[in-house]
Amino acid sequence: MTKKTSHHKAEQKEKRAGEESGRESEVLDHKIEELENELIGAREQADKLREELLRKAAEFENFRRQKEREALMAGSRTLETVIRELLPFVDDVVRIVEHAPELLEKTEDARPYVDGAELLKKNLVRWLEDKGVTRIDALGKKMDVNLHEAITQVEYPDVEPETVVEVFQDGYVLGDRVLRHTKVVVAK
């Protein structure tokens, strides 16, 4: 082979190598571009998933808080129901204690029963207070339809009209909720 031919072959070989290198470079550039696009897509997908995860976490937290509130409200309603059902018994014990002096005047044998009734009243009142229940103080106050139920009106010349002059039955509140209105007699 001649120098020219071998040089020509070498040039062709170089040219082919350059073309192949160029094609490889093109292929690599194309592959890099594909990978960059995939990366961009993956990042966008990750951002969407992150946002959705944050949204779901917030929804779950709101759901948890709502269930806590509902549980508290259910417990509160149950407590209110129990207390409302207990109030007539409280009234009975209070009446027994109020009439105890009359009973003791008749017979000292009633002393253990009176002492028991007083202890029962004390424990009932303490239990109600521990639960947040308070008796509505009505005597001498202005009639308030939110707290009082007037059962009658009576002439009291020395008392301002609409003033509670007698409590017929005690009323109670639990926090800001009226469990039972105080039944009252009001001055005309």
Curated annotation (Swiss-Prot):
InterPro entries: GrpE (IPR000740), GrpE_coiled_coil (IPR013805), GrpE_head (IPR009012). Keywords: Chaperone, Cytoplasm, Stress response. GO terms for biological process: protein folding. Participates actively in the response to hyperosmotic and heat shock by preventing the aggregation of stress-denatured proteins, in association with DnaK and GrpE. It is the nucleotide exchange factor for DnaK and may function as a thermosensor. Unfolded proteins bind initially to DnaJ; upon interaction with the DnaJ-bound protein, DnaK hydrolyzes its bound ATP, resulting in the formation of a stable complex. GrpE releases ADP from DnaK; ATP binding to DnaK triggers the release of the substrate protein, thus completing the reaction cycle. The gene is grpE. PANTHER family: GRPE PROTEIN, GRPE PROTEIN HOMOLOG, MITOCHONDRIAL. It is found in: Cytoplasm. One of its GO terms (molecular function) is protein homodimerization activity. Residues 8-30 have a biased composition (Basic and acidic residues). It comes from the Bacteria. Homodimer. Belongs to the GrpE family. Residues 1-30 are annotated as: Disordered. This is Protein GrpE. GO terms for cellular component: cytoplasm. CDD domains: GrpE. HAMAP family: GrpE. Pfam families: GrpE. It comes from Chlorobium phaeobacteroides (strain BS1).
